[in-house]
């Protein structure tokens, strides 16, 4: 969801009743995200779309295809995207790591802001929930350093 928020800033489709509000974000840090809600190709994709149809959108993709496109960060990459730090566990069995790689590549192809991608070795989905683990600790530290860099860069530009 953080990717979708970052890539739909000021999009009136997603802010009914407050279309004039600034909904931009300074940076995005998606972790093990699902960036493509449309493609049925690849490991776990058909099951994911079935899950979306039954529990999330509650509408069939064949009848409401645009809804799925609109909810897919992969189809919303844009030149003015904020800086991104994309993290994905290399051993994620719920969302294959390839999806993170493809999203990072697509975003790098168009964005003028930095796009950082990190694959966490031997990490499963939700690897960051194990707060006592070294993997979670170092990942949190890397996120903090990235966000501090974004903030410092923004301050320098403002001066």
Residue ranges and their predicted role:
Residues 108-126:
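Catalytic histidine neighborhood in serine/cysteine hydrolases
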Residues 34, 90-92, 122-124:
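Acidic beta-to-alpha connecting loop that harbors the catalytic carboxylate
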Residues 80, 85-88, 92:
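Short beta-strand/loop motif that positions the catalytic acidic residue
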Residues 7-8, 39-76:
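Mobile cap/lid helix-loop segments that gate and shape the active-site cleft of serine hydrolases
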Residues 1-44:
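Primarily recognizes the serine-hydrolase "nucleophile elbow" in alpha/beta-hydrolase
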Residues 123-136:
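Catalytic histidine-centered segment of alpha/beta-hydrolase-like enzymes
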Residues 133-159:
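Catalytic active-site module of serine/aspartate enzymes centered on a nucleophile-bearing elbow/loop
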Residues 93-102:
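Conserved alpha/beta-hydrolase "acid-adjacent" motif
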């Amino acid at each position: 969801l953080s990717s979708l928020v970052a890539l739909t800033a000021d999009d009136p489709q997603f802010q009914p009743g407050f279309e004039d509000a600034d909904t931009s974000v300074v940076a995005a840090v998606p972790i093990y995200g699902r960036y493509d809600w449309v493609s049925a190709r690849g490991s776990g994709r058909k099951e994911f779309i079935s899950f979306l149809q039954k529990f999330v959108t509650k509408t069939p993709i064949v009848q409401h295809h645009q809804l799925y496109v609109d909810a897919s960060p992969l189809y919303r990459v844009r030149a003015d995207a904020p800086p991104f730090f994309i993290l994905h566990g290399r051993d994620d069995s719920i969302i294959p790591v390839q999806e993170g790689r493809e999203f990072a590549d697509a975003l790098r192809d168009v964005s003028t802001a930095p796009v950082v991608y990190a694959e966490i070795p031997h990490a499963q989905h939700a690897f960051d929930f194990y707060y006592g683990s070294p993997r979670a600790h170092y990942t949190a530290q890397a996120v903090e350093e990235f966000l501090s860099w974004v903030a410092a860069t923004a301050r320098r530009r403002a001066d």
